[in-house]
């Protein structure tokens, strides 16, 4: 708003300056015509001369002798006498009433250089649009004002946009930007749906709602399968666990018992040798061993049996309690060594799955 106000003030100053220049030019022309008339009057005092603003007969105002009426009053019809010379180039032809207000310069200065025009007159208030005044000046004075139309900024003003037009342009740009963003969003959604359709194993759905429902059902099925796999898979947990129980998963062939021992603890280099020593001390033989390590944690699943057959009740009471206490001691030893070496650098986390299966041949059992 400030910039617009400054531009309007500059245009008003330029307009006032141009009007003053026009008045000065017309004033010089007026006095030049008076001098020319006086010079010609000494040669022919009985005649009067008519000078036009553009050098044409009857197109301007009439200059009379000294005994005639003052030019500020009503003027008689012009004669056909032409001036002998005209040193200054006159402006282009203008309406006859244009010079009527020129002689009343004192009032014009007090009213802010107000000019009178045919069809316009002094009825126009000072609040009238400045552009209309510039347009009338340009049409009335022709080349005089047209040459100064650059400083007036008339053409520039006509090319300027109004505040409402600027707001409309901004709204149009915002609407186009919103439409472009919406188009890109829909394109991304369609690309994601196409990827989901390609991931599903067997899909015949084409509409978006059915496709999303099928994807949700497939994700639920994958989650259920993952839960089942996690229960049966040998993945070590974050907490230490120890379970010892009889099992029928493995058979010796001669009717001997089989015990399944599951051990989950921190991994260390001497864990496996300690377990082997413990089992040998209890006179147990390993039939199968499954070992899984993930990120410094290890899970051992052992299937063991006794070396010699004995009573079933004695075996159950002896094996379950003894194996559980022995493996618990191995776990505690692992925890103590882990706490003592906590200041050392941590072992690099890595995942591996190793399965060791030790199965004795049936011929060895039969020989016994």
Curated annotation (Swiss-Prot):
Positions with biased composition (Polar residues): 337-368
Endpoints of the signal sequence: none
PROSITE patterns the UniProt entry points to: BHLH
Domain bHLH: 173-222
SUPFAM superfamilies: HLH, helix-loop-helix DNA-binding domain
Key word Nucleus present: yes
Record's GO cellular component terms: nucleus
Region ranges (Disordered): 333-368
Protein name per UniProt: Transcription factor bHLH30
């Amino acid at each position: 708003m400030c910039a617009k106000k400054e531009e309007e003030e500059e245009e008003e100053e330029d307009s006032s300056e141009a009007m003053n220049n026009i008045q000065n030019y017309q004033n010089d022309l007026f006095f030049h015509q008076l001098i020319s008339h006086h010079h010609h009057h000494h040669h022919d005092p009985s005649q009067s001369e008519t000078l036009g603003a553009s050098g044409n007969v009857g197109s301007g105002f009439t200059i009379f002798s000294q005994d005639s009426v003052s030019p500020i009053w009503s003027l008689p019809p012009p004669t056909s006498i032409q001036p002998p010379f005209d040193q200054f180039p006159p402006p282009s032809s203008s309406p006859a009433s244009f010079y009527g207000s020129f002689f009343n310069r004192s009032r014009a200065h007090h009213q802010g250089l107000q000019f009178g025009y045919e069809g316009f007159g002094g009825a126009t208030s000072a609040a009238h649009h400045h552009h209309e005044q510039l347009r009338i000046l340009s049409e009335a004075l022709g080349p005089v004002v047209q040459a100064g139309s650059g400083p007036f900024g008339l053409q520039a003003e006509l090319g300027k946009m109004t505040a409402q037009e600027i707001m409309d342009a901004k709204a149009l740009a915002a609407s186009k930007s919103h439409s472009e963003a919406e188009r890109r969003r829909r394109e991304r959604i369609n690309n994601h749906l196409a990827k989901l359709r390609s991931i599903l194993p067997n899909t015949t759905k084409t509409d978006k709602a059915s496709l999303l429902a099928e994807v949700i059902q497939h994700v639920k099925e994958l989650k259920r399968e993952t839960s089942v796999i996690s229960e049966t898979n040998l993945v070590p947990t974050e907490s230490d666990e120890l379970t010892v129980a009889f099992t029928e998963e493995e058979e010796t062939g001669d009717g001997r018992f089989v015990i399944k021992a599951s051990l989950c603890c921190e991994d260390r280099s001497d864990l496996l040798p300690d377990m082997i020593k413990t089992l040998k001390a209890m006179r147990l033989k390993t039939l199968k061993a499954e070992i899984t390590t993930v990120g410094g944690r290890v899970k051992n699943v052992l299937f063991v049996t006794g070396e010699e057959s004995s009573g079933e009740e004695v075996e159950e009471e002896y094996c379950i309690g003894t194996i559980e206490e022995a493996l618990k001691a191995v776990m505690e030893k692992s925890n103590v060594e882990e706490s003592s070496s906590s200041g050392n650098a941590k072992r690099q986390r890595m995942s591996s799955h190793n399965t060791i299966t030790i199965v004795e041949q049936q011929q060895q059992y039969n020989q016994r």
